[in-house]
Amino acid sequence: NSQIGVPLSVWLLDQHTDVALFEAGISQTGEMQALRDIIQPTIGIITSIGQAHQENFRSIDEKCQEKLLLFHDAKTVVYNSDDNIVSRSMRKSGYNGQKIAWSKEDPKAALYINKVTTKEATTVVEYTFNSTVNATYHLPFIDEASVECSFACAATALHLGITPEQLDIRMSQLEPVAMRLEVKEGQKGCTIINDSYNSDVSSLDIALDFMSRRPD
């Protein structure tokens, strides 16, 4: 997702490529413009605006606005309309393309999350898409971060024409990322949650929340 990694990924594309998915990360102002020129995304997905690299920005609003530069020329942007910072930055950005919002609070959002139910190691999400499709999908995760990431994924997939049935099948087949909330059995009845892939205040909070949700 860096100034080096993104160009290397773009070079892997050829005439047989139908879809390419890039993560674009920044650590200071001015970096996103370079990534935008390289990626030139058709669809932009805003995941979360955390505390990583916050020391290089005057405010979290500034960082969010910097990230939104990536989507200036994108045809579609998918975002969480419940996030006040993201919603405010979207309005300030002057973006004129198609906006696809997901929300747990606004029934008028393109993807409205009606209900989220956690059962042991599984999460069931009930949703309405474009006020007409009512369906459900299952996730093999229970942590809040993974569940919320699935909302953006679902909104994008449904927008691209994936059926609710296909979405449910693929969501249920997702696998954990290595070193991200990995549960390992320790000695003498101890349980270890390995979240060493990356760590900041936000990810630590997610790990503690995940630990408190576990049935054991």
Go through each PLM region and give its residues.
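Inter-motif core of Ras-like GTPase G domains
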Residues: 34-49, 216
